[in-house]
Swiss-Prot record:
The modification N6-(pyridoxal phosphate)lysine is found at K231. It is an enzyme of class 2 (transferase). The keyword Transferase applies. It comes from Nitrosococcus oceani (strain ATCC 19707 / BCRC 17464 / JCM 30415 / NCIMB 11848 / C-107). Its EC number is 2.3.1.47. The gene is bioF. It comes from the Bacteria. Homodimer. InterPro entries: Aminotrans_II_pyridoxalP_BS (IPR001917), Aminotransferase_I/II_large (IPR004839), AON_synthase_class-II (IPR050087), AONS_Archaea/Proteobacteria (IPR004723), AONS_Proteobacteria (IPR022834), PyrdxlP-dep_Trfase (IPR015424), PyrdxlP-dep_Trfase_major (IPR015421), PyrdxlP-dep_Trfase_small (IPR015422). Pyridoxal 5'-phosphate binds at G100, Y101, S171, H199, T228. Catalyzes the decarboxylative condensation of pimeloyl-[acyl-carrier protein] and L-alanine to produce 8-amino-7-oxononanoate (AON), [acyl-carrier protein], and carbon dioxide. Substrate binds at R13, H125, T345. It catalyses: 6-carboxyhexanoyl-[ACP] + L-alanine + H(+) = (8S)-8-amino-7-oxononanoate + holo-[ACP] + CO2. This is 8-amino-7-oxononanoate synthase. Keywords: Biotin biosynthesis, Pyridoxal phosphate, Transferase.
Length: 377
């Protein structure tokens, strides 16, 4: 699509320049803005303990890793974090990746090839869809959150290996994947189930162990687990968790791991501190749950059309891309930042305001958001 066409269809993307740290309020364009579009779900990106750990990591390791993990970039800090994350999600091994995007591409391409097939939810994150397309395997998309559609697709395949891929929490609507049903279907057809838990880790399940734990499942049902560190954990990077053989396979074959400079060790030190906060400060999840309930109850009373989501992601469906952009602009004029999500990120005709809540927000701030929505709609 040409740039001019994007502009006329209200699909043009812009960057905003922040002038300070993440938080419920942001410094932007010379003024304070109340933001409801961050993925910093637990409010840890600017936590004093995380910041102090990062600075300690800089003092110990410097600011850059200098090389890929397989050369001289893998530090004791990286290794310690991998072990801590493995214990947290209840898996034998974890492998750190620089980003969630590279983790998903690396896993899928390392595990399947031309004689295989990958089955993906139609609304999976772009990194999962790209991973499936680039792997060279037969690529099938099943209907959103529909395990029977997946079952029909698996019935028709004669592929050597079968990989089922889903988000744990879908990033644009906040809905949970039906993991127990997907796991049962995958098991029946001898397929691997891969869950990208970018938006569930830290938020769902006991002690924030994610969407797989939320459903009472484990490695036997979902052998491949991907998590990101830049959302609820408030830092940067990603990881893949699973059995010993999976991790060793990725070390040998995942090109996005082999040929990428390792993240700074200081980030690993900061993430370890953040992980301890996730484990010990359950009040953050409790508060987030209360704020979600407050927002949904208020929205229902106002007649707002929300997606059915129990997560911090609370999209307000608009439909038309231009209308969504105008609503976002009206909110910004009132000092509230909510991003308009438009095609191709979401299907045509389903543009929305992607409202996200965090533990850093207050009840008064959520009430202000509801009041502003009434005024702009």
């Amino acid at each position: 699509m040409e740039l001019r066409q994007r502009q006329t269809q209200s699909l043009y993307r812009y960057r905003r320049v922040l002038e300070g740290p993440q938080g419920a309020e942001l410094q932007m364009d010379g003024r304070r803005i109340l933001a409801f579009c961050s993925n910093d779900y637990l409010g840890l990106a600017n936590h004093p303990a995380t910041r102090a750990a990062f600075m300690q990591g800089v003092r110990e390791y410097g600011v850059g890793s200098g090389a890929a993990h397989l050369v001289t970039g893998h530090s004791r800090a990286h290794h310690t974090l991998e072990e801590a994350l493995a214990a947290f999600v209840g898996r034998p091994r974890v492998l750190l990746f620089s980003t969630g995007y590279s983790a998903n591409l690396g896993v899928i391409s390392a595990l399947i090839g031309r004689q295989d097939a990958v089955f993906e939810d139609r609304l999976n994150h772009a990194s999962l869809l790209d991973g499936g397309l680039l792997a060279g395997a037969r690529f099938k998309r099943y209907r959103h959150r529909d395990y029977q559609s997946l079952e029909a697709a698996l019935t028709a395949t004669k592929a050597r290996r079968r990989l089922v891929v889903t988000d744990g929490v879908f990033s644009m609507d906040g809905a949970l994947a039906p993991l127990p049903d997907l796991a049962a279907v995958a098991d029946r057809f001898d397929a691997w189930l891969m869950v990208d838990d970018a938006h569930g880790l830290g938020v769902l399940g006991e002690e924030g162990r994610g969407s797989v734990a939320h459903f009472g499942l484990g490695m036997a049902q979902a052998p491949i687990l991907v998590g990101t560190l830049g959302k609820a954990l408030g830092t940067f990077g990603a990881f893949v968790a699973g059995e010993e053989a999976l991790i060793e396979t990725l070390i040998q074959q995942a090109r996005t791991y082999i040929y990428t400079t390792a993240p700074p060790s200081a980030v690993a030190v900061a993430t370890l501190a953040s992980l301890r906060l996730v484990e010990t400060e359950s009040w953050r999840r409790d508060k987030l749950t209360r704020l979600i309930a407050q927002f949904r109850q208020g929205a229902a009373q106002l007649g707002l059309q929300l997606v059915d989501s129990p997560t911090p992601i609370q999209p307000l469906l608009v439909g038309d891309a231009g209308a969504a952009v105008k609503l976002s602009e009206r909110l910004l004029a009132q000092g509230i930042l909510v991003t308009a999500i438009r095609p191709p990120t979401v299907p045509e005709g389903s543009a929305r305001l992607r409202i996200t809540l965090t533990a850093a927000h207050s009840e008064a701030q959520v009430a202000r958001l509801l009041e502003s929505l009434v005024q702009v709609l």
